[in-house]
Amino acid sequence: MKKIDVTEAIILAKKERNLTWEGIAAELGMGTVWVTSACLGMNSMPEAVAEKLCAYLELPEGAKAALMEYPTKAWDKEVPQDPLIYRLYEVVGVYGDTLKEVIQEKFGDGIMSAIDFTMDVAKEENPKGDRVVLTLNGKFLPYKAW
């Protein structure tokens, strides 16, 4: 079974059972963003988590092995047409250089890890319209001279 097949089975089971990513993550005892990413094929699951997910969603045989496989973390190089994803590209396009300057001013020359990393999505109620709060929390990795 391939990762894409498992992703499709997960999405179908989620829909049929009227579940949320947050609910699935809570059942697994893991973070919502990470579980969603793993279910969409962009992270590999530890065996115990994969077993629990397969049992919870009654996934077909072979799903556990596919969930545990190391993913190829690649994506299309074209800017996505989905408006929400496009806006994230736009944020980086408009503010990327600014973020780089501010981060390097505070930390020095380096990067933010996407390996030693967590991400959270929260909803903030606001009288002018509810706000999306994205928190990206990555370890700073300084470049070294040699």
Curated annotation (Swiss-Prot):
It is an enzyme of class 4 (lyase). CDD domains: Cyanase_C (cd00559). GO terms for biological process: cyanate metabolic process. Its EC number is 4.2.1.104. Gene3D superfamilies: Cyanate lyase, C-terminal domain, lambda repressor-like DNA-binding domains. Keywords: Lyase. InterPro entries: Cyanase, Cyanate_lyase_C, Cyanate_lyase_C_sf, CYNS_N, Lambda_DNA-bd_dom_sf. The keyword Transcription regulation does not apply. SMART domains: Cyanate_lyase (SM01116). The active site is at residues 87, 90, 113. Catalyzes the reaction of cyanate with bicarbonate to produce ammonia and carbon dioxide. It catalyses: cyanate + hydrogencarbonate + 3 H(+) = NH4(+) + 2 CO2. This is Cyanate hydratase. One of its GO terms (molecular function) is DNA binding. Belongs to the cyanase family.
